Regions:
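Short glycine-rich substrate-engagement loop in P-loop NTPases that contacts/grips substrate
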Residues: 1-11, 21-28
Length: 93
């Protein structure tokens, strides 16, 4: 299954992670996948525009368990450099 392939690959990158896009089912699947990868000691990298404070204080109860697990098991690197995506969006307007 796709889930098992994601659970076994050496490194998984969850790009542009945004919990607003997840329903309760999606949050549960992602939590289970991340938990399994942690047990297998596999690399999982999340990229996101979410600030650390938002991870520490989720607005929705469904996000708390996943966010707590991410915070407890990751290095959070905040990049406050120039937002090139926003600049590109403005070029197309």
């Amino acid at each position: 299954s796709i889930f098992e392939q994601l659970a076994r690959c050496k490194a998984l990158i969850v790009d542009d992670f945004n919990p607003e896009d997840l329903n309760a089912y999606g949050a549960t699947i992602l939590f289970n996948l991340y938990e399994l990868r942690l047990k297998r000691k596999l690399i999982t990298c999340f990229t996101s525009n979410i600030k650390k404070t938002a991870l520490e204080n989720p607005q929705k109860p469904k996000d708390k368990l996943l966010f707590d697990r991410i915070i407890a098991n990751t290095y959070i690197v905040e990049d406050s450099s120039h937002n090139y995506r926003k600049e590109m969006d403005n070029d197309f307007e």
